[in-house]
Amino acid sequence: MNKAIFLSDFNQNSTPRDPFVFYHDGYFYHLFAMNDALYLRRSAELEDLKDAKSKMVYHDDKFHEVWAPELHIINDKCYIYVAMDDGNNYNHRMYVLENNSNDPMVPYVLHGQIKEKNERWAIDGSILYHGGKMYFTWSGWEGLENVCQNIYIQEMSDPFTLIGERTMISTPEYEWEKRGCEGGNNRPYINEGPFAIYGKNKLHIVYSGSGSWSDDYCLGVITFEGGDILDKNNWKKHPTPILSRTETALGPGHASFFEDPRNGKKYFTYHLFDTDAKNGWQGTHAMIQEYEMVDDFPVLPKPVNHFIDK
């Protein structure tokens, strides 16, 4: 289970930030944002994904700071959920793209913004299913100030539309969720990158805590305990991170999870710093590793630095 697969770095004609990998119709796909555009690449074998040719599937000059895209196939059609702004971070919102196809490589067009009635800052949107309904989860601000990012959930009536009210289900509480943060000065407390994992009888959301600009970026998890999924009291936060730094693998975070249906193996992909945070977000790469569900809870191996942990 400890085998690590190198996915990408900034020398691979791709970006390692916020990696998203999925399997569909015989191929593994890697979706990423680079230079304010979205790209996909695919390969039949996971180990070959790093060398696959990239194809641009979306670009619009009016959007900037294009972050953390995810591709979800809903009713046999492909949708990309992505955070974008107009060049001002305060205007980051979630958008949905579509290509009217079940082929992920077909170019996408903008359907529109995922509109939440409070019109608050929003990034890192993802899809969650429970009880025959579809929900949207994301990282956002409670108010208008960049002091704290929380995890929210809200029901969807279709791939484009939120209904009802948003519910905050996680906010930074523990010391390990607040490292590198100030609660202001563009260093907000961080809960971001929510991603659902489905156990046999449990639903979990894995998220990232602490500053993504710090060596202490890590993964935490909240677990749905049953009842109303939109009641924050029905979500329980695990008191310790499930993935955190080692002496050589610093700042591991923003993960996505997927399965190889051919053999049932479970994988996650994440980014981390090449050396340390002093080189900023440019000095990062992405890895893929196997994980296990033990007693219906995600158990992740230690992160691996491709350039150091030989």
Q: Whereabouts are the PLM-identified features?
A:
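Carbohydrate-active catalytic/glycan-binding domains of CAZyme proteins
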Residues: 1-310
